């Protein structure tokens, strides 16, 4: 059982509650607060020099965060997800900005101030999307803004170097979000590995193999997992988004408007965002089978909210996942559920075998005692 932790305090709490690593660190949370202005300058930069300057500031800021989290989890795996949400989430609300512009016009603001505000509003409008969840986010951001995965990888690698020099054992894992095409993970992995080499050359410190993997959160990724696994050291099933995309449910919309009637009318037995749906579980199982067939020894986990649900944990154990990851306060409950699954499941755990002899793995029930 690992934990989802986005800051050093959560990492330390997770460790105290028995987590055996960090299964998800969401780097976008590190861009909020005082740093929001830096990411805004990066997004809205007019020149490559301006963007490069903002990128370096972001990288330096994140290096400190990664250093603290990796230090707190010394010797344990820490899976760091590259930037995932749409960029407009870091910008001012266009409606609020339009209201501000109208007030400026009424109050007689200078022509220069009005021109700058109008230009900003136009840039923000250009970044708005009809369906941001399936738009410019995840790994797609890395192709639209190549500086992003580089600056984040530099920060991870530099933090790792600092800790190694202190005699510690940092174990970062870098996770590429929202992959559905094998070419996406192939190209993004190459970008990440080049950035790691940059830091090795810069510092003279050999970092060894830093695992690079991906989130499986789209149905196509699950059914094409054998191709994706060729370029991924691990899969982490993002069951929140996988549930939305598999069921066609927008969580923000259906939880208040659809699910109450569905639950009351017994159309569905339970909230699929709390306990994993059987169709989503089949996609996870397919991803596990295909991934292990193509890459024996690949690490498989879950980092959605289902990772803290006892019923879902039993399902994931039977499907052969290696770990679940949940919020820090759900770690004790998840550990208990994992122990119960281990003791009562009739399914035999996977046993690592040599790649050359590995067929698609099959789950076999234990033989009844003689």
Model segments located where?
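Conserved alpha/beta-domain cores
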Residues: 1-347, 357, 366-370
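Intrinsic low-complexity/disordered segments
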Residues: 361-363
